[in-house]
Amino acid sequence: EFNEIDAQLVDVNLILNFMGAVEQIEEWDPKKLGDLGKQFFKFQERVPKYYDQLYKKLQSQQIGYSGLKYREATQNLGHYMTSVQAFHFFVGFNALTKAEEVIFQELIAEGRATILWDLDKHFYKNPYHSAGHFIRNYIKEWAFLNQKFTSQFSNHFSKKKQIEIINVSKNLSQARTAAQIAINAYLKNPDNSIVIVLGDERLLHTILTSISSEGIPWNASMGYPLKNFRGVNVFLKIFELLKTNIDGSYILSKVNAITDEIYVMTLLEASGIPIKKIIKQRKLKRSANLSSKHVLGKSVIGDLIFMPFENSDSFIERMIALSEIIKKHLILNKFSSLEIYCIEQISVLWRNVLSINESKLVLEKLIDIELVFTKLLDNETLDLKGDPFRGVQIMGLLETRILDFDHVIVTHLNEGILPYGKTPFPWIPFDVRKKFGLNTFIEQDHLYAYHFFRLLQRPKRISLIYNDAAEGLFSGEKSRFLIQLEYFKRP
C-alpha cells in the first residue's frame, strides 16, 4: 500500500488519516468495541507513524522500494535535468503512475524527450475500447502531445490474420494443447518466432516437459515458482504427518497422503518397506492409526520420513538427507532436468533453514520450522535459462510488452484469469482509492486489455485457448476479450 501511495504521489498523511476516520465511522460503535476492535484502531492510528519511521530509515540508508524511488525522482527532477543533458526515448509505455506522468511531461515539454506509443489506430480511435484507455487520456490531457504523437499509431490489427479460438476441458489440457500447437508450428517453420503466453504459471512444468521431449529449444522468461514443483508436497505432507504423532503413532489418513505423493511410494517399496501392504492391513483391521514401529529401523528412507520430531537440528538434517535421496532417484530414473534442478533448490532451501536455526533465531518447535520453510518457499523463483532468439518463448502477459511474434498462443482466456477481474484490495477500499486517484480493478482491466490486444496487432497466426469446464474457483466462463474479438469480427 505504501508503494502505490508513493508511486501515485498521494499525500501520505491525508490518505492514512482519512483511512482511520473512515474505519471509525463505517465499521464500529466505540461503545461496543471488543479487544480485537481496540487493537485494530490502535493499528490504524499507528500506520502514519509506521510510514514515517520507514521513510526515515530508508532515507538514512539511501535505499527504497520502487514507489518511494518514484516519489523522490519527481522531487529531484530539476536537479536531474540540470546535470543530465541526454535526450530520452520513452518506448512502449501505457499505464503510467502519477510520478511517471510528471517525469514524462516535464522532459517532453522541455524538448528533452519523446514518447513512442505501441498502439494500433483501431484501439485509439474507438473511444470505448479499453486497450486505448490510458493513451487516449494522456493525449487529451497533456497539452503538448500534438498530432505528431498520434500519427505514429500503427495500422496492423485490421490486417488479415489466422485466428483460432480453442475450448478445452480441464486446466491441464490447456497446457498440453498450447505445447502441441507450438511444437507443430516450430517443426513446420523453425524460423518463425513463437510465444506461449501462459495465464497460470503452475502449468509451466507441463509445457516445458512436452516441448523438451521433442528436442525443441525454448526459453522461459517468466521464472518458475519453486512452490509449484510437485516434489515440494513431499515435505509439506511430512509436516502434516508428524503433527499427528501420539506416542509414535500417526493418523492413517496422513500416512496415506504422504505415500500418495510422487517418489515416496516407490522409494519406500524399493527400500524393503511394503507400505502398500501395511496400510491395507491397517484398513482391514479398521484401525485409524499406524504405529511407526512398522516402518522405523527398516530403511534409511523410512526413518527420514517417519521418525517422530525430536529437535530442530536433527529434523532439518533429515530433510536435507531426504532431498539428496530424491535427487539421486530422479537422476537414476532420468527425470527431467527441471525436476532435478528443483529438488536441488529444495535442498538449498533446507540448508537456509538450518542456517537460520543456527543463528540467534532458534526454531524450537516443528511448527516454527514449517513457518520458516513455507515462507522461504513462497519467495523462491527459479530463473530458467534458454535461448531468447530461437524456438518457443514462454512468458506471462505483462512480459510481452513491446515484443512481437509471428505466432502467438495464449492460454487461460477465462474470466477471472485474463482479465483478472474484480478483486478486493488488501487494505484501502475501492471508494477511497477512487477519491485519491489510486488504481482499482477498473484500471487493472484497462491494463490487461492493452497488453492482450497489443499482442495481437502484428502476428500472422493467433491461437487462443480457454477452459470451458468449471474447475475450482473458476466457472469456465469465456473471457470478455474473446467475446470482443468474435462480436466485432476484427481483424
Task: Write out the residue ranges for each language-model feature.
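Nucleic acid-machinery interaction/catalytic patches
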Residues: 1-431
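Accessory/regulatory regions of helicases
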Residues: 237, 253-257, 262, 414-491
